Amino acid sequence: MQEKARRNLLIETMQKGGYAYVDVEDDVKKSDVEEAAHSLGMKVIRSIHDFQGVPADIFSRVHSLASRGDVAKIAVTPHNIADIMTLFRINDELKNVPKIIIGMGEWGVCTRVLYKKMGSMLTFGSNGKAVAPGMVSARDLKLLYRADKLNDNTGIYGVVGNPVMHSLS
C-alpha cells in the first residue's frame, strides 16, 4: 500500500471516533495525520524505534520528540545495564513531559515492568503473543509483576548472572 493511501486509511479510521491518541513515527514530517488528529481532539505521540541499539544522540532525539508532539515515545534496544541506565536518565531530562520509554528485547523487559518508575505514562503488553521483541503479556504485567502498582518509590533490586530470566529470585 502506498504511503498516501495508508495515511488516508488511518485518517478515515480516526474519524470513526473512539481514539485518544495516534502514534506518528518521527521521520514523518508535519503531516495531515497530525492535523486530523488535533482537529478530532486526539493527542499525537511522536515516536522513534531503533531495533539495533540505543542511539548515541538519544537525549537530543527525545527533546526533539517532546517539542514536536503531545507525547514523546522512544522504543530502543538496550544491550547492557549502561543502556538501561541511559533510559532511566531520560526521565530526569524530561521530568514533566508526557512520555513513553520502552526497551525492546530481553534487556528491555525491566523497562516494561518499571514503566511508572521511568516516568512513562503507559507500557505495552500483548494478549499472550509478543508482537515486539521483549514484549510481556498484559496478564504477566498485571498479575506476575504488578507493574500497575509500582511507582517512583519502588526500590529496585537485581539478580546478577547470565542468564537470569529463568530465576525465581
Predicted regions and their residues:
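Glycine/small-residue-rich loop that forms an oxyanion/phosphate-binding "nest" at active or ligand-binding sites
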Residues: 1-32
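Alpha-helix initiation/capping motif
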Residues: 2, 25, 151-154, 169
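A generic secondary-structure micro-motif detector
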Residues: 22-23, 101, 163
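Catalytic alpha/beta core domains of metabolic enzymes, predominantly
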Residues: 27-156
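An N-terminal-biased, well-structured beta-alpha scaffold segment characteristic
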Residues: 158, 162-169
